[in-house]
């Protein structure tokens, strides 16, 4: 399915009027979380990106370590990859879906997963630390 066709089918599923991509990107908000939907022509895929937030200045490195653990087998991130933007230093959740298998239903599930991941990790980032004892709450 083409990017614009997919985004309009997803918008209809969400009860929205058609959406217009700007520079290959559409931003929609779910539960107060903006999710960017970006077309990646090089890999014929759709990339979803949602910002988790900036780490507190006094972070001791435990957040980054916890995110690396969460990325292991994607078990603590609902299939998303947790990362840090090198320019803004903000943490984000990123999920890639091949356009060849994407449809409105799959996109709805992906959005649910990325929103759940961001909600969970916003709490962890706000606390400023994620030690081993916190791991059980990180499973989303």
Predicted regions and their residues:
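Short, highly charged C-terminal tails/helix-capping segments
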Residues: 126-140
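A short acidic-to-branched-hydrophobic micro-motif
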Residues: 37-39, 44-54
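Ampiphathic alpha-helical segments that act as solvent-exposed interaction surfaces
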Residues: 66-67, 71, 97-129
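A short local loop/turn or secondary-structure capping micro-motif enriched for an aromatic residue
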Residues: 45-46, 56-57, 100-103
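Hydrophobic residues embedded in beta-strands of well-ordered beta-sheets
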Residues: 26, 44-46, 89-91
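Short, internal acidic amphipathic alpha-helical interface segments
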Residues: 51-90, 94-96, 139
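Structural motif
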Residues: 22, 40-42, 87
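Charge-rich, low-complexity N-terminal segments
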Residues: 1-36, 75-77, 83
């Amino acid at each position: 399915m083409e990017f614009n066709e997919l985004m309009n089918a997803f918008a209809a599923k969400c009860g929205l009027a058609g959406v217009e991509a700007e520079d290959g990107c559409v931003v929609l908000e779910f539960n107060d979380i903006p999710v960017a939907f970006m077309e990646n022509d090089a890999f014929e895929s759709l990339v979803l990106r949602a910002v988790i937030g900036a780490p507190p200045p006094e972070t001791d490195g435990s957040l980054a370590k916890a995110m690396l653990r969460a990325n292991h087998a994607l078990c603590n991130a609902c299939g998303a990859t947790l990362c840090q933007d090198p320019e803004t230093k903000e943490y984000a959740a990123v999920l890639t879906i091949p356009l060849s298998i994407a449809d409105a239903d799959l996109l709805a599930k992906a959005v649910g997963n990325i929103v759940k991941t961001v909600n969970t990790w916003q709490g962890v980032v706000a606390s400023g630390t994620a030690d081993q004892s916190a791991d059980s709450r990180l499973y989303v």
